[in-house]
Amino acid sequence: MSSPDQNPSDAAGQTGSSNEEVVDVRRGMFGVKGTGDTSGYGRLVREIVLPGSSPRPYGFYFDEIADRLAEALNRDGVEFEDAIEKVVVYRNELTLHVRREALLRVAQSLRDEPELRFELCLGVNGVHYPHETGRELHAVYPLQSITHNRRLRLEVSAPDSDPHIPSLYAVYPTNDWHERETYDFFGIIFDGHPSLTRIEMPDDWQGHPQRKDYPLGGIPVEYKGAQIPPPDERRGYN
């Protein structure tokens, strides 16, 4: 297994990206408004910022990955810009934001091209940005090249109104349960998955509990008919 020939801390373009995008401003620990909480974070206000597109050179081995992927896509009649929305280098990590209709082609090229060989997909994570209109749901795939000792991420977005993303099961079969979990918790529908059913919540569960718009629930207590209210409804002391 080869080692990268440059330390990412020395790479050009590794410090950040341009055109950062503010997708939300959260107040308090749970992002609720108009009510108190007992967490001690009731006065916390922070912007949720997503890094923007990075300019070339990306640094480290990232330029080589982009170039080899572009060549592979071109052989299949696909332009790099038609498949990749943006390339982000942030905190020494490479993320390719992929258009969802091109996800399977990009993943297969990354897996099969000898100079890329990202043989391992470590699963898929869901993210929900309710204020990012038209791109509220994100699926993030960490990839690892065992051959070349390299890492990158693929990120795909979909709107709440059309939460469909192609399944990567055909390219990375080990994503089977990971896609089921992301569907279970975020409601992303992975088209082409052989058995997209809930994997942790009961089959008749209503909603997807890791979405930001999912209501915070209280805890039923078995004695005296009491119920602990959800965090955003508790009395505040600040």
Swiss-Prot record:
Its EC number is 7.1.1.-. Disulfide bonds: none annotated. Keywords: Cell membrane, Membrane, NAD, Quinone, Translocase, Transport. It comes from the Bacteria. It is found in: Cell membrane. It is a peripheral membrane protein. GO terms for molecular function: NADH dehydrogenase (ubiquinone) activity; NADH:ubiquinone reductase (non-electrogenic) activity; quinone binding. NDH-1 shuttles electrons from NADH, via FMN and iron-sulfur (Fe-S) centers, to quinones in the respiratory chain. The immediate electron acceptor for the enzyme in this species is believed to be a menaquinone. Couples the redox reaction to proton translocation (for every two electrons transferred, four hydrogen ions are translocated across the cytoplasmic membrane), and thus conserves the redox energy in a proton gradient. This is NADH-quinone oxidoreductase subunit C.
